[in-house]
C-alpha cells in the first residue's frame, strides 16, 4: 500500500512540474524582491542549489519547509554573504523542536545595497545627498513528520523593500513536502532509499512602492504665465509580483 502511494505521489509531482513550468515562464523579468532567489547556507550553495530533497537543517526554512522536521535538536544558523558591488546579504535563523508537535523555525534575511549618490536631471554628478536601499524578509515556519516517511512544512513570510524614502511590502507563503521511499534501497529501509522533495516559494501578494519620493511639484502649463509650477503631483508606480519558485529534487 505504501509503495502504491509513493508511486502515485511521484507521478503527480512530475505532472505538476510540467504544468507549473508552463505557467510561470512568462513571469521572468517581471518580478520584484529578487533577493528571495538568492540561496541560503554554504552547504546548499556548494551543491549548486540542488538541496530541496536533502534539506535537513535550519536553512530548510528557505529551501524546503518540510526538511525542518528532520532537525532533532534546537539549533541556529548565521550567515553573511558579501555579494556583488558592495552588496551584503545576511541570514539569521533558528529551529526549535517541540516534542509531539513538530519543529518551529524563525528566519530573517537582510540585503543591504549600501549608500549611493542622489542625482537628478540638474545635478547629474550628485546633489551632495546620499541614499540607501535594503530588502528584508521575515519568515515563520512550521514543519512536522506526518508519518515516518512523509514530512510537510509551511512558511509565512513578510517581505519589505526600501529605497530612500519609498518602500513596499508583501506577504507570502511557502509550502514543501519531503518523501522517503525504499526505491533503490539496498537495505529495504526508507532512510536508505530515494528521497523526493518539492517546494513552492513566495506565493503571495504584489509589491508597490510608495513614499514621499513619489510626490513632486509639476508645472501643468509650463508655456503659460501663472502659478502653475507648484501643483502637487504623484508618480504612480506599478504593482509587481514576487518571484514564484518551484523546486523538485531527488536524492539517493
Positions of the model-derived regions?
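Short, basic and Ser/Thr-rich N-terminal targeting/leader segments
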Residues: 56, 72, 87-88, 136
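Bacterial Sec-dependent N-terminal signal peptides
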Residues: 1-25
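N-terminal periplasmic accessory domains that precede
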Residues: 59-70
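Short polar/acidic secondary-structure junctions
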Residues: 52, 68, 83-84, 183
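Short, flexible loop segments at the rims of nucleotide/cofactor-binding pockets, characterized by
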Residues: 53-56, 128-130
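Short strand-turn segments of transmembrane beta-barrel domains in outer membranes
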Residues: 49-52, 74-83
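Outer-membrane beta-barrel porins/channels
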Residues: 23-45, 81, 88-252
